[in-house]
Each structure stands twice: as C-alpha cells, then as structure tokens.
Amino acid sequence: MATRRLSTIHSLAIVALSCVAIAGCGTQDGSNPAGSALPSAPASAIPGTTEGATTADIQAAKLEPCPVSDANVAPVADGLPDLTLACLGEGKPVRLAGVRGTRMVVNVWASWCGPCKAELPMMGEVYRDNREKLACLGIDMADDRVAALAMAGSTAMTFPSVQDPKSEIRAGLKVIGVPTTLFVRPD
C-alpha cells in the first residue's frame, strides 16, 4: 500500500514538474514565442467526423470513450472553454465547459510533437493508476485524425481524447504550445 501511494505521488509529482517546465517555455502574454507557430490541421481533419480514419484505426488506438458532457450548465470563469469538440475515439462530441464533477488532468498533445510522444505513455500510466480519483482528457490539437489515432495506439495512452484540428482551445486555455498539461477542479 505504501509503495502504491509513493508511486502515485511520484507520478503526480512528475506531471506537476512537467507542467512547470512547459509553462516556463512560453511568454507572459500568452502569445507565441518567435518561431513556435503551430502547424495547421490538414484539410482531412474535420471535427465531428471520422474522415480518413477507419473503424479499425479507432479500435486500434484503444482509447476509452469520451466523457459525457452536460449541455445545460453555464461555463464558469477560468474554467474549461465553452467549445464542443469531436471525440477522437469512440463517443459523442464533448462540450468542454460541460465536463465537471471530478478532478481532471487535461493534456493537450499532437502526433507531430516529439515531447508529446515521450510524455503520453507516462500520462497514460498516471491515468490508469489513479482513474478512480482523477479523470483525464486529452485534446489532440492541430493534427490529422489518422496520425493522432496511430500515436494514441503506439503510446498506449488509453485515456479519452477529443480532437481540435483548428486549435480553437488555444485562446481559452492559453495554450502556447504542446504538450500542455492542466489541472482542473471539479467545479
């Protein structure tokens, strides 16, 4: 029991330190540092569709279904933005502002991001070890759906993810670059 508790504490400490390190790479005003423009999503990456992705691609990724969101709750100040994004794996679109009720880690990632590829297996482990106490939601940003599903499968991340091919969450979450990890309160 003590080993498991230490493992959980160790995993959460790594996530927290990663957040601090990543936050230090941006600018104070939330603008892009020189040379850090995010690529645009390919035309085939259309939210709400599986264009380019087969059922086999979705099943191979082994992502858990996206959380159910409440369409009727009002967004909260400094909360998740009021955006509805397509589920990357199986599930209905998710209204970010409507996902509440549990502590949550939100991880913004992309298949073209080298640090994301290194971080996602660890994020998946934290999720599997703490899923009873802590929800996790990935946001695949500025990416191709097929490439994102392939990376999800190759990193064994398993936590549910939504797709944001147009990078709409950048302003609402003050995302400077990827990976970005945020901790969200239940309320």
Language-model-detected regions and their locations in the chain:
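N-terminal targeting signals for export/organelle localization
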Residues: 1-86
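Conserved hydrophobic/aromatic "anchor" residues
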Residues: 83, 94, 108-109, 151, ...
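Acidic helix N-cap motif at the loop->helix transition within catalytic regions
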Residues: 96, 146-149
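Thiol/disulfide oxidoreductase modules built on the thioredoxin-like
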Residues: 150-157, 163-187
